[in-house]
Amino acid sequence: MLALESPLVKLKKLFEIFNFSFFFIAFIYLFLSIFTSFQAFKINEFYSELNPDINGIQFEEINFKNKFSTSLNGWWVEGESDNAFIILHGLRSNIGEKFYIDLISEFNNLGFSILAFDFRNHGKSGEGKFSFGVEEVYDVDASIKYIRENKNIENIFIWGFSFGATTGLNYSIYNTKGSDVSGIIADTPYYDPIEVLIDEVSKRTPLNSYLSKLLKPGIIISSKVFFDNDLENIKNIFESETINNTPSLIFGCKNDTTVPNSHPRRIKKKLGAMSKYVEFENCSKHGDSFIYNNEEYIYEISNFLNEQFEIKNK
């Protein structure tokens, strides 16, 4: 006859199972938090060698430095007016991609000069701290100073996509006087990079949305520990009491799963009366709005620009 286990032995086994489960879950939690942080701060080294010449656009290779002496590589395209656009590319991208070159052509056809440059850690530019658009505002500031000091330009507008859009808007919020730029066009900016990262975890792992959200504290802490970066900074900037004085046109994509339309909608709400929100339905993924809605996209931009010129001339 088998001897029955004593309550003490059973309790010991339960304790061992509990310990194993706890440490296993903790290990998985730490692994996913750290892995997500490292993936978030990993910049793709891919560089496209295309330039505006493929569209028959003449350009000048330029180089300037931000306040940290980081070398920033770019192009200058001369326009017919004294107005200019600064092109701010997306994350893990560079100005040599055809998407941006086609935009340069569109803006140049409107008579604008264009300064397009690679952010730090991207393309041919130098290395620097990556912060999802917080410290990158100094790259934007350097591009504006380059134009003011070297070109005969009166009105400067910013067009940015995703990471570039959020960075451009952050610059306008920092710049409380609103005098450096005449307007910002932000194509699918993100409101909170942590949300974007958590959504990616739920799409790429067996974890559902609820379980992925539990990783938020771990991702925030590991980003601070390993990269000296507070991922809540972007959201805090948008939720600050700073009043935005720069007119902004914000684009969203109804079917965007990378940066869902809830992000640009919240940004529009934050920026208030100085902003306008346009949402495109004919887009299947992040960055499709310009490609599949070209005429409407440029039409909205032209109207926005004309409104700013009319206000200025009153």
Q: What is the meaning of each model-derived region?
A:
Residues L14-K65, W75:
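An N-terminal hydrophobic leader/cap segment in hydrolases
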